[in-house]
């Protein structure tokens, strides 16, 4: 799109195809689901007369909100606006009519359903009103009015369930109409049985997603972990187990807490039993389970490479701030849990003895083991209010046999992570550009480098020599890297404008290669630490979220392992997204992305929203945040997202 074509974006009156100027208007078409026969229950106690079973209760069990059928058909009304339904030859039948209501602007009004038959009205899957008794003819009592309030371009799913009776005196019929309040009489709206709805905040927050994957150390199997959100308070989680060679799911209901033992392809999980935990191993491919240890002090385990011991956190509550006057030792001390601490414990499986590894001072974090488990990295960060960047980080190497410690790094700022090389002689450290003075800084004339521009450094343990590996590499490293023991290369995610791909760094020559991942925004990835054939990952874009992939690293081909939200999102009418760059007055090229409204008409003008995140990280392609452009575009805005970072 060039600069001239951008003129279509300025504010002008809006219209929606198929919408009409608002007034009381009846639905002319609905989707009719296949009829379902129902029967009265066996009634055995007349003492319940005050709570006698009513006809409308037959409709309550026929929700049908999620019915999936190819047999539904579109029904049209007669000249009076009624949908004529068939009277059953015998007994009673539930007829279900479905439509949608969508306004261009905010609207209030009443959904009115009229029928002499018994019926129930549902809006967005929730019962909003019903008529409990049949009439011999349509009267004033045959009308049920449901108040409706809708945001602009918000779709309301309407379902009317009608109980038809072979013994009824009249032929069943139903009328569905919407009457706006007088102050909203100029708002356009549609009342049609659309197959697709426009994107809503619930499409962003709800639904099933693959949230992470975990590959076995030998690369033969992948755990995929899922979450499905139903509401703010309701969700479910589950896991599956997939064989990488065949792509076959060999366990569709894997224990949700299952993880990998440090080598091979043995699964483990813990079971709480009283005040302690049992350790259960699952052998593959047989999937037979065995309890291999009991009496463990925790279920949250960080395994050593040889599985002879594990490390876990011990929580130590800090002193509580009480009284009306508070003395804060630092800005961070304003946070309620700032004085709480988490220290590290070591549990030896052969002796069943738990030994403290750290205690006192700042909270300590484990940062991984060398290949044989004889050494461990521990990180501690503390506040330093007297000088920028206001935090200091110590990286300490611990000899797990003698408890001797060696402080490898005393850094200014946040040292995000560190990982051992396969031979244990080097580390790959991720942190800000100023972590080691000016070694990682590439900020031109700016006096302070962007701390969010995370860099990668090679650190030689014996000599303490630091080599910046990504100073001239534009993307910023994200998350924890993986130093693969099979090919000797380092894998990491990186922010690259709107995208978050995965890169592979060869520490021998410093070359960096982008992997051809299929997702625009990779949320996480997993590689077996002793193989280099497969990589699993999850990702999202503007039109999908929570997909799980398996990549063959030899061919670069990715296959979709799971896309649980595909069916639900197929019912969403997304707006088209396209890149749009321009050159600023100082000559800087500004990267940008444009999202057009669904059903965009290039001959019309639209209001424009420019979204510019003022932080130091770029905006990313995805639909799992509150400022997703699809949400604004669904309200008939053109959305332009700047990425000047």
Stretch-by-stretch model annotation:
Residues 23-83, 100, 159-198:
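Accessory carbohydrate-binding/adhesion or oligomerization-edge regions at the termini
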Residues 103, 108-121, 158:
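Aromatic-lined ligand-binding clefts that engage carbohydrates, nucleic acids, or primary amines
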Residues 106, 123-173:
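Beta-strand-rich ligand-recognition modules
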Residues 191-208, 354-356:
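A short helix->beta-strand "capping" segment at the edge of beta-propeller domains
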Residues 207, 226-238, 251-252, 270-280, ...:
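A flexible loop/linker signature enriched in serine peptidases of the S9 family
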Residues 213-221, 257-267, 301-309, 367-376, ...:
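Blade-terminus and WD-like Trp-Asp/Gly-His loop motifs, strongest in beta-propeller folds
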Residues 243-246, 283-287, 348-352, 399-403, ...:
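Short loop/turn segments that connect beta-strands within beta-propeller blades
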Residues 524-645:
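Serine-hydrolase catalytic core recognition
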């Amino acid at each position: 799109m060039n600069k001239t074509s951008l003129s279509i974006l300025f504010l002008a009156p809006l219209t929606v195809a198929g919408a009409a100027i608002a007034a009381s208007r009846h639905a002319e078409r609905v989707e009719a689901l296949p009829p379902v026969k129902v029967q009265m229950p066996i009634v055995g106690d007349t003492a319940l007369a005050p709570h006698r079973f009513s006809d409308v209760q037959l409709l309550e069990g026929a929700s049908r909100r999620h019915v999936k059928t190819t047999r539904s058909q579109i029904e049209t009304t007669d000249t009076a606006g009624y949908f004529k339904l068939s009277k059953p030859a015998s007994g009673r039948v539930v007829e279900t009519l479905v439509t949608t209501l969508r306004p261009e602007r905010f609207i209030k009004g009443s959904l009115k359903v009229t029928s002499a038959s018994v019926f129930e009205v549902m809006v967005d899957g929730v019962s909003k009103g019903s008529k409990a008794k049949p009439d011999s003819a349509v009267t004033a009592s045959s009308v049920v009015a449901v108040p409706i309030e809708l945001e602009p371009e918000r779709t309301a799913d309407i379902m009317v369930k009608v109980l038809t009776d072979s013994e009824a005196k009249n032929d069943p019929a139903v009328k569905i109409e919407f009457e706006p309040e007088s102050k909203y009489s100029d708002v356009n709206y549609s009342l049609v049985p659309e197959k697709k709805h426009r994107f809503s905040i619930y499409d962003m927050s709800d639904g099933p997603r693959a949230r992470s994957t975990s590959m076995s150390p030998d690369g033969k199997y992948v755990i995929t972990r899922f979450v499905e959100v139903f509401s703010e308070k309701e969700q479910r989680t589950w896991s599956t187990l997939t064989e990488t060679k065949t792509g076959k799911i060999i366990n569709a209901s894997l224990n949700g807490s299952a993880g990998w033992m440090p080598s091979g392809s043995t699964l483990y999980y813990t079971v709480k039993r009283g005040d302690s935990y049992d350790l259960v191993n699952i052998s593959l491919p047989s999937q037979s389970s065995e309890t291999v240890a009991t009496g463990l002090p925790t279920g949250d385990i960080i395994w050593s490479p040889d599985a002879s011991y594990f490390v876990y956190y011990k929580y130590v509550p800090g002193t509580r701030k009480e009284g009306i006057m508070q003395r804060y030792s630092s800005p961070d001390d304003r946070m309620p849990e700032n004085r709480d601490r988490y220290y590290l414990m070591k549990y030896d499986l052969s002796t069943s003895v738990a030994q403290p590894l750290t205690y006192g001072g700042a909270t300590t974090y484990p940062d991984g083991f060398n290949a044989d488990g004889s050494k461990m990295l521990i990180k501690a960060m503390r506040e330093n209010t007297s000088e920028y960047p206001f935090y200091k980080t110590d990286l300490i190497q611990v000899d797990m046999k003698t408890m001797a410690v060696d402080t490898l790094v005393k850094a200014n700022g946040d040292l995000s992570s560190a990982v051992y090389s396969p031979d244990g002689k080097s580390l790959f450290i991720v942190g800000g550009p100023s972590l080691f003075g000016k070694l990682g800084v590439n900020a031109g004339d700016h006096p302070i480098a962007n701390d969010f521009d995370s860099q990668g450094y090679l650190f030689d343990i014996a000599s303490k020599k630091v080599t910046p590996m990504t100073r001239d590499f534009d993307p910023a490293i994200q998350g924890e890297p993986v130093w693969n023991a099979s090919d000797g290369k380092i894998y990491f995610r990186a922010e690259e404008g709107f995208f978050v791909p995965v890169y592979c760094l060869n520490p021998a020559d410093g070359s960096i290669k982008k992997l051809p991942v299929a997702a625009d925004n990779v949320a996480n990835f997993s590689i077996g630490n002793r193989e280099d054939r497969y990589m699993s990952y999850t990702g999202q874009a503007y039109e999908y979220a929570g997909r799980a992939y398996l990549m063959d690293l030899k061919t670069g081909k990715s296959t979709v392992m799971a896309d649980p939200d595909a069916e639900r999102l197929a019912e969403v009418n997304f707006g088209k997204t396209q890149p749009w760059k321009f050159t600023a007055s100082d000559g800087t090229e500004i990267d940008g992305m444009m999202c057009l409204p669904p059903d965009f008409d290039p001959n019309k003008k639209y209001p424009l929203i420019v979204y510019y995140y003022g932080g130091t990280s770029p905006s990313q392609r995805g639909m799992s945040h509150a400022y997703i452009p699809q949400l604004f575009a669904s309200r008939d805005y053109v959305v332009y997202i700047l990425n000047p970072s």
